[in-house]
Each structure stands twice: as C-alpha cells, then as structure tokens.
C-alpha cells in the first residue's frame, strides 16, 4: 500500500521540485514562458529523469540477479520478463506502451526479429513518454492557471507597505 502511494506521489513531487529548480535558476529561459509551458517543461524533464533512473536501477538489478543466480541473462529479456517494466509502463507511460506494443505486433506479424529492439524500445519510451508527459503537464498547468486566475478578486489595489 505504501509502495503504491509512493509511486503515485513521486512524479508530481518531482515535477514540483524540478519546476522550482528551473524557475529559481531561470534554466532554459523558463521565466519568460507562460505558466502552462513551464509546468509542461518541468513534466517532460521529470519524465526523462524517472525513466533514466528506472533503467539504471533495472540494470543494477540485472547485475545482482546474474551474480546471485549464476545465469547469463541479457538486459532485454530481463527487462521485459522479470522487472516491473510493463506494469510501470502501462500505468505511467500509456502512449509509449501503445506505440511499443503496436510496433512489436507489426514486427511479429511480418515475422521479423531485428537486432536492437531494446534500443528502439528505449527511444520510443523517451520520445513518446516525454511528449505524453509534456502535454499532460501542460494541460494540468493550464487548469491550474485558470484556477489561480479565478481566485483573484478583480479589484487591483495598489501595493501598500505592510509596515
């Protein structure tokens, strides 16, 4: 239960942290952009960080598995068959999952098994997943912008000194 809660809270908290780091240091000239684009950019960068972290830790998990089991397993079969890759992909990267499954089904129907499918999978995850989270984060940012604009009172008072 705690793992499930943490897995759903980690991406928004990471986006929140990345957003504030980007705005504090004005990276990518983010302060000149509209609010929804700032949130979208933070979401895309957060996706890149999360995917890279997952793939690196999956590789470390493979190394531990090889050391403990004494088997010679390649990274591709280990990633697709023995890790939480598909579960996390279907939850967080739906567009990339559909693209990967579509590509694999087309290749299977054609009877082709080209080399480098793991690299193609990583490319699809990075491109499609980042675009998905860019637009999803942008949509959430636009909704938040509308919400915050609705909270304003409408009468713009001059700023008074509080002391």
Residue ranges of predicted features:
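Membrane-helix boundary/juxtamembrane interface motif
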Residues: 2-157, 162
């Amino acid at each position: 239960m705690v793992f499930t809660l943490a897995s759903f809270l980690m991406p928004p908290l990471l986006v929140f942290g990345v957003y504030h780091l980007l705005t504090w240091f004005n990276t990518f000239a983010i302060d000149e952009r509209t609010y929804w684009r700032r949130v979208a950019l933070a979401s895309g960068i957060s996706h890149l960080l999360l995917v890279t972290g997952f793939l690196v830790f999956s590789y470390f998990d493979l190394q531990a598995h090889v050391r403990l089991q004494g088997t010679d397993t390649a990274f591709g079969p280990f990633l697709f068959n023995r890790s939480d890759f598909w579960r996390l992909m279907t939850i967080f990267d739906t567009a990339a999952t559909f693209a990967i499954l579509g590509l694999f089904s087309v290749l299977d129907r054609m009877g082709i098994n080209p080399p480098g499918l793991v690299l193609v999978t990583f490319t699809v995850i990075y491109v499609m997943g980042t675009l998905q989270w860019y637009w999803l984060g942008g949509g959430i940012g636009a909704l938040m912008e509308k919400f915050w604009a609705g909270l304003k009172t409408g009468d713009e008072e001059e700023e008074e000194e509080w002391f």
